[in-house]
Amino acid sequence: MKTAHWADFYAEKIKKDKGPKNLYTVASGITPSGTVHIGNFREVISVDLVARALKDSGSKVRFIYSWDNYDVFRKVPKNMPEQELLTTYLRQAITRVPDTRSHKTSYARANEIEFEKYLPIVGINPEFIDQSKQYTNGVYASQIKFALNHKKELSNALNEYRTSKLEENWYPISIFCTKCNRDTTTVNNYDNHYSVEYSCECGNQESLDIRTTWAIKLPWRIDWPMRWKYEEVDFEPAGKDHHSSGGSFDTSKNIVKIFQGSPPVTFQYDFISIKGRGGKISSSSGDVISLKDVLEVYTPEVTRFLFASTRPNTEFSISFDLDVIKIYEDYDRFERIYYGVEDIKEEKKRAFKRIYELSQPYMPSKRIPYQIGFRHLSVICQIFENNINKILNYLKNVQEDQKDKLINKIKCAINWIRDFAPEDFKFSLRSKFDSIEILKENSKKAINELLNFLKKNFEVATEQDIQNEIYKISRENNIEPALFFKQIYKILIDKEKGPKLAGFIKIIGIERFEKIVSRYI
């Protein structure tokens, strides 16, 4: 039977390719050389979705996330203060670079903390592995010795995809000088036991004992497959750059076999672009969109939905423009289908329900969450001037167990209006009454008739009733309906257009409507 979701497909593939196991290990990781952006998050959530699918099939899963923080600091991001100071740390391990924003921790750790803080909000709780501690505590000493003893095999594996071959005096390690802390070093000799001799551009020369030194690490193309074997990784995806022909994944598949391991099940995930915000995703430039930024506009459920509803090998955009409304509408439809409020063809229902399940940070609630369209909510937020208590009081039949998610959605709407909504979407109810042109007598009469109709019928009139009455009154007073609408908007919000007028009036309420329009009739 066809699986309901791509994550379920890969869960089945892992079990088939790796055989029955008491524990399956899935992995992700990144170098925290800058803000961990939403493109990096795609890998993390892809692994989380597969981990959930494995768990749902009855398997035990270990989800590890490696901070590759013993990598070299190669470039100063443009958004970091004290650029000159940071330049002095180039070529050192990024764990040694200070965080010039907080001055409380290292640059790498600050980036890690920022990312770790938001993952549980979207239901992701991996086991974090600090690779700098692994190396400096000697955890990989035997793996380093193994690599040095298999130098020729590793060289051949790397050369298979290189245009310029490695030199004969190449060694499968890099060394941070113990004097200047930089990796500007050359390995001069290995005694085939535990001693490595090196020299540094700073003039330092010495021998290191593999078993006790903090300064030796494996280069990334060897380190990655070494850890596949060390952690017994069963699944790890990678971006299209790593999966290109002859790329790092092809090399690593061969190198892990030298370490007497096997490559994990994998897939290629594509890039993410940003729509309605501008700027290219780049950690080194500092112009990035982080998970925190996305959660300002999208609730945790909808954030997960963006990824769960898209195949990983498909490029897609995360929108901050008017498409936000459509994305929320799509999510709400999946929610209605999941809870049986809306029906679709049976062959689609299973897939829709599975996407909804995987979109939840934790377990789906027993009853359907309170539903309100994002466009409608955005109007309500502006009418009540972003006062959450007033918004909740206006909305009807909100149950206590629905409030938290609803409040989160309200906050996202408020943030979106403030930061990203187009100007013609924004409004505020008129509070000053000195900037409107004098209305003609027939317009004053028409607005007065509308006010009287509303005062008599407001509680029972539907939006359609109000809409019909506006058209009727405009025609009876020889006013073009388009002009009459424009005049009412101008009175209410000092703009020539706005939200759908009948619904807008219903939300404002008769008292506020009368208070404003009575100044002009």
Swiss-Prot record:
Span of the annotated motif 'KMSKS' region: 280-284
Any single GO BP term: lysyl-tRNA aminoacylation
Pfam families: tRNA-synt_1f
Positions of short motif 'HIGH' region: 32-40
Catalysed reactions listed for this entry: tRNA(Lys) + L-lysine + ATP = L-lysyl-tRNA(Lys) + AMP + diphosphate
Keyword Zinc-finger: no
Secretion signal, residue range per the UniProt entry: none
InterPro entries, alphabetized: aa-tRNA-synth_I_codon-bd_sub2 (IPR020751), aa-tRNA-synth_I_CS (IPR001412), aa_tRNA-synth_I_cd-bd_sf (IPR008925), Lys-tRNA-ligase (IPR002904), Lys-tRNA-ligase_SC_fold (IPR042078), Rossmann-like_a/b/a_fold (IPR014729)
Name used for this protein in its record: Lysine--tRNA ligase
Source species: Borreliella afzelii (Borrelia afzelii)
